[in-house]
Amino acid sequence: MDILIVFAHPDDETVFIGGTAALLSERGARVHYVCATRGEGGEVGEPPVCAAHELGEVRSRELACAVHALGGASLDFLGYVDPPVDADGNGRAFAADPKQLAKHIAQAASACQAQAMISHGSSGEYGHPAHSLLHQAALRASQGSPGACLPLYTFSADFPGHPRRDRSANRNDPADFVIDVRPWMPVKLAAAHCHRTQEALFVRRASRLAGHLVPLADVLMSVESLHRAWPTCEGRPEDALADFLRNRCGEALLASPAGWDEGQA
């Protein structure tokens, strides 16, 4: 099957869903990646990997490296420009007309003949405005698909043992699938290492929260989760991606989201 992962910045594909993406590719799915921006407003690395004006080009190459590591089938960009962080260091949304953004996502889904789409959650994970903007646009694209039949799943869905529940779980998106990606952590880590300009940021944030130095391997979550945002459902989702996960990836699925022990992550 063909699956489209659409996200705001280079590295979101690895941080939030990299293990699951690697699993899906390994089991025969064609996973396509579409990034809204080239991450022009991010950090340049410590020590600097490039000059600020080169960052978009460099991060595009980093993303291509990560997609290759994850076994991706294709990579494309929507061409929006990632703005610099604000004076307090908070991320900002890129400039986009919501309807046009949704149209671009729908075109990308059509181009790769996606049978399901995965994107940011309703809370923007940790409240990032660009993530929230992408979520709304992806939802609009899914709802406007022919017959409104393109399922949309969102990552970092909430469940009781979510290892980042207080920091990056989408608390209004209950998990329909919780995936133990520990066997795919070497692939996820390889993809994370592709994002050289952002490695210091990953480690710095996690270390500040932990109160001690945290290596990159321990920054990455070894459990990931998905919520079906559209069509809405109560109980067991039934669609092409749900069937693929159950039939091809069953051993990685937790029987119950509540069954995950936070200490395992």
Spans of model-derived segments:
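Active-site rim/loop-helix segments in enzyme catalytic domains that contact anionic ligands
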Residues: 1-112, 140-144, 244, 252, ...
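Metal-dependent de-N-acetylase/amidase catalytic core
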Residues: 1-4, 89-265
